[in-house]
Amino acid sequence: EPAWHAAKIVPLPSGGTGLPRGYLPALSCPSSGSCSAGGAYSDASGRTQGLLLTMVRGTWHPSTKLSPPANAGQDPGMTIGALSCGTAGNCSVVGGYQDATGNTQGFVAREVNTKWQGATEVVLPGGAAVKGQISSVHSAACASAGNCSSVGTYLDNASPISGVQGFTLDEVHGVWGSARQIAVPSDANANPFVAIGQVACPSAGNCSAVGSYIDTNNVTRGLLLSERGGSWQPGTTLALPGDANAFAGAALSEVSCVSPANCTALGTYTNYKGAVEGLTAVELHGVWTRGVAMKMPASAGANPHVFFYGFSGLSCPSVGNCSAGGQYLDSSDLYQGFFINEVDGTWQAASTLALPAGSRAAGRNGGVVAVSCRSAGNCSAGAAYLDGAGNYQALVVNEVVTVWRIGRRIALPNGATTVGVDGGVYGLVCTTRRSCTATGSYQSSSTNYQGFTVATN
């Protein structure tokens, strides 16, 4: 199994002081020794800038600032939402920023042969609000160099109140197009309040995305989206388990695809007892099956309040074989982390994240955040938990032949004693059996966070 080293601090661009709210969400490693990561940092003037990291041949290069779009405000508030690499050194990054008029806009930026280009504003669909816009690109997936798809949300110009709509946005042969409004299911509310979880693209122009919308009864429903041959299809509604509440509040947060039209999604819903449970859904040959309730650990409370962080907590190395992780509330009202495995097409009962000695709980800001599988039943994960003194710590956990081991605390840079409430492992990718990389953040002082990288080789 992989042996993890101590974490190393991420040196910030000149004048950088720290990471706002410890935000370093994005990591993509298309091959062993080649990774890109992204987040946000505060510059010397306290402005929020986009942060980019690139690993070449196993070595992290000095971090760089992502140049904001030309119409960005004085404080661009650059916030990277996701990053994906088609091949080593050829990636795309997406997110949101503040323009000079105070609107929040979406952006995209490309890395070409390890050189990051400046970010450009997303051209929103016709009918987007001109004033008071709040738009952002939430997720991106690149199937090959220069071929990516992304999903996000924006405000339309409906009166008297703008509606929250979703959009898709494709990069084809290195050129990003304009955003297109997602066609929501026919039972959607006039304001569908679209929320987007993730997109996954196993091949160029063939993607699946998940999220949620609100129907005419003000019930939140799971939203499923498919792109086939470069064309996005109208959204469909996830069918829920038989024990779902009439007001099930279903939402899908993560998706992973093994091949085009063969994907797995994770989410949550409320059952008829009022308990928030986890669910899995499978797309087979382009058809999404009814969601299936997760079986939580025996220690789960009557309402386990299942929660997924939505970064990279699901990994499917082959059809019918997945591993995932999240958080739940146990019968003692303590927040715990959990793992759940799909083996040869059958989801097993979830297991509790095993914590180091002296710890009782993962904590409200703890649990499993990132999962990456090299092969079926052989995975690694990043998590956070509360130590015996009540401080949050970062944890790496290895799964060997479908058995999750006890997690190992990450040794933080410069003698730091906690990752804080906003820190921990955000991204983790394993490219081979023994080669894994993780990124995250930790609390460096009472008011500041810094980034870290940690690896196995």
Describe these PLM feature segments.
Residues 1-457:
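Residue-level hotspots at or immediately adjacent to binding/recognition sites across diverse folds
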